[in-house]
Amino acid sequence: MAHALKRILYATWYPDILVNYTHSVNCRRTLDVMSETNNEFLAALESAADQIKVGDVVTGELLAIDNDNQAVVGLSTGEEGVVPAREYSDDRNINLADELKIGDTIEAVVISNVTSDKEGVAYLLSKKRLDARKAWENLSFAEGDTVDAKVINAVRGGLIVDVNGVRGFVPASMVAERFVSDLNQFKNKDIKAQVIEIDPANARLILSRKAVAAQELAAQLAEVFSKLSVGEVVEGTVARLTDFGAFVDLGGVDGLVHVSEISHDRVKNPADVLTKGDKVDVKILALDTEKGRISLSIKATQRGPWDEAADQIAAGSVLEGTVKRVKDFGAFVEILPGIEGLVHVSQISNKRIENPSEVLKSGDKVQVKVLDIKPAEERISLSMKALEEKPEREDRRGNDGSASRADIAAYKQQDDSAATLGDIFGDKL
């Protein structure tokens, strides 16, 4: 390289001398003097080159962009450095030819040097790292502050973000209130995050999106709660499904439809009847502002079997039903599809029943009379006994052996001369 610089210097600085030196001895002497001067200059350049080290900030002029998408930079020392695209920007798809033009000035930090037998010393430079260093030096936020961040990438452990040129990290556990299985949904998005830890000396910046998300959710809840009231029917979108129910988005806030509130029919798994993204009408059952919970019902917005029952059944109706369950206190009888009423143990028979299972079992067909129906409470009281003939009242003698009313009535129907009380009761009188 020194030889190349000599040739360049001779050709550019002393063209007349190079042309005429063969014609004059004086010119040869002049060349000797200038050669010595140039050697001293080259030595100075080489000495300056030796002084460039890793970590130094250098400024150079863009000479070319090579086939590897690297910016070739001419340094003030007369040497060259290269800035790979990956060290120019975080944008993996950047094309330096679209960003730079020949002659542009580039400031970068030296991250390594490479020695080549032919080319001398070349430096690997990074503009991106210099920008980050400057950003750290000019920090305008502190721990606890909320900042705007750009998500650069999603990795297994969390999100890599850029905050005003400073590289930061949001751990997966701090991305949201609940576990996020796919972090890629945040790539290239702008987020707000709270500064949890900041260590400029080690270029360490830890942030939490969850803390800010919780504040945003609280604000959203307050706004949504102010617009809702218990008993109101609103439209929502199924946001996610679980084994115990479906979460419905009511406009930025989710409410829960418990599996028991999805349908009037029995639902084993919410995914059997609902799909994420479904539009559904829901009735608001409860609003818990303290815990930020909203209880919803889909089935409450639909006409169910009890509505049909109210139309078809009235107190006094006699129906045939099927025994579904037998309990100690009575038997549940299905009188319409999905509609069961209770026959209390006292309403099973005119005879004394200790346990309903003595006379009834699941699957039995029985005749019942409706004693009372309350559709709003989904309750029907039934009776089997009411359909039985009432037995004649048995009048028995008292425990002390006295005559029963039946005996006395029979006596009164007899002629006074037919018999005496002694004839009737014998020695019991």
UniProtKB/Swiss-Prot annotation:
Task: Report if keyword Cell division is assigned.
Answer: no
User: Sorted alphabetically, which Pfam families does this protein's record hold?
Assistant: S1
Q: What molecular function terms (GO) are annotated for this protein?
A: mRNA binding; structural constituent of ribosome
Q: Which residues form the S1 motif domain?
A: 55-128, 144-211, 231-299, 316-385
Matches recorded under InterPro entries:
NA-bd_OB-fold, Ribos_protein_bS1-like, Ribosomal_protein_S1-like, S1_domain
Q: Which SMART domains match?
A: S1 (SM00316)
| An example Gene Ontology biological process | translation
GO cellular component terms attached to this protein's record: ribonucleoprotein complex; ribosome
Compositionally skewed regions (Basic and acidic residues) per UniProt: 382-399
**Entry-linked CDD domains:** S1_RPS1_repeat_ec1_hs1, S1_RPS1_repeat_ec2_hs2, S1_RPS1_repeat_ec3, S1_RPS1_repeat_hs4
Q: Which keywords, in A-to-Z order, does the entry hold?
A: Repeat, Ribonucleoprotein, Ribosomal protein, RNA-binding
Spell out the residue ranges making up region: Disordered. 382-412
Q: Provide the function of this protein.
A: Binds mRNA; thus facilitating recognition of the initiation point. It is needed to translate mRNA with a short Shine-Dalgarno (SD) purine-rich sequence.
Q: Which family does it belong to?
A: Belongs to the bacterial ribosomal protein bS1 family.
Q: Which PANTHER family match?
A: 30S RIBOSOMAL PROTEIN S1
Q: What is this protein called?
A: Small ribosomal subunit protein bS1
Taxonomic source organism? Leuconostoc lactis
Query: What lineage, starting at the top, does this entry show?
Result: Bacteria, Bacillati, Bacillota, Bacilli, Lactobacillales
